[in-house]
Amino acid sequence: MTLSLANYLAADSAAEALRRDVRAGLTAAPKSLPPKWFYDAVGSDLFDQITRLPEYYPTRTEAQILRTRSAEIIAAAGADTLVELGSGTSEKTRMLLDAMRDAELLRRFIPFDVDAGVLRSAGAAIGAEYPGIEIDAVCGDFEEHLGKIPHVGRRLVVFLGSTIGNLTPAPRAEFLSTLADTLQPGDSLLLGTDLVKDTGRLVRAYDDAAGVTAAFNRNVLAVVNRELSADFDLDAFEHVAKWNSDEERIEMWLRARTAQHVRVAALDLEVDFAAGEEMLTEVSCKFRPENVVAELAEAGLRQTHWWTDPAGDFGLSLAVR
């Protein structure tokens, strides 16, 4: 096993991005905070709990598809290199790596993430499980550094978990177009998309009975409090999940239970919340199969294969340029 890590992020890039995002979001109308700030250590643990909840079907459904279709996916892709946009520590990653190993194709794993620590631990774990594998980790930002992913071998780039749904249509189109530009002849993209379904099931997946998603949502306030010396009262905000039928997306909001005055000392910023005012913290767009094909085509990609679960809850696309 060989392990390399290329880091394209400045040491203070995360701190600067947080400052920029919080100032922009808290001075906008409606107020908002980007979902990437959910994921400190506490938030990551809460999200791991969410993926195991009975109401939260996406993770287990995507895993079910991969469990039954990984060999087929790898046969179609013919890849010797797995590029994962994300941490590379999940069960789903291993299903694909196992299929590549079983097909005697596996040579290389390239995890891409914003967190160098996550990349090191993921790389070490994968290296221990797959002797002889070459690991070329890339620490970077999706918006800036996709072009830094090494052009080596025949690559299968995977973007799972319907993370693509956290992008609204314009940024999503830009992301897919940029990603398409990085693909060379012989490369493939495996894209996970959560599909439009019964509204009740969708809302429950983001508003579970145990309140884990509510704690996850409020945790973004704890991150701002800790990192930017703010004084949000977490208990003064309630979690709200709703279906936006026009945009076909779930939205997560934090609603002020009473009027609030919040100071963010590190930004020298003070903001007021009216009682009942809602702040947007996440969108999770859902897809129709024909729209997935169209969005890929718009980015210059051709869907060659489509896999879904028996209930049609979740879809995996294999696409090429």
From Swiss-Prot:
Q: Does the keyword S-adenosyl-L-methionine apply?
A: yes
Per its UniProt record, what PANTHER family does this chain match?
A: ERGOTHIONEINE BIOSYNTHESIS PROTEIN 1
- Enzyme class, top EC level, equals transferase
The catalytic activity, as recorded, is: L-histidine + 3 S-adenosyl-L-methionine = hercynine + 3 S-adenosyl-L-homocysteine + 3 H(+)
Cite a single GO BP annotation.
ergothioneine biosynthesis from histidine via gamma-glutamyl-hercynylcysteine sulfoxide
**Changing M252V does what?**
Dramatic change in substrate specificity since the tryptophan-specific activity is increased more than 2000-fold and the histidine-specific activity is reduced 3000-fold
Any signal peptide, and if so, which residues? none
Q: In which pathway does it act?
A: Amino-acid biosynthesis; ergothioneine biosynthesis
Please report the name of this protein according to its UniProt entry.
Histidine N-alpha-methyltransferase
Question: What does the record's free text say on domains?
Answer: Consists of two distinct domains: a typical methyltransferase domain and a unique substrate binding domain.
- EC code(s) of this entry: 2.1.1.44
Species: Mycolicibacterium smegmatis (strain ATCC 700084 / mc(2)155)
> Pfam families in the record, alphabetically?
Methyltransf_33
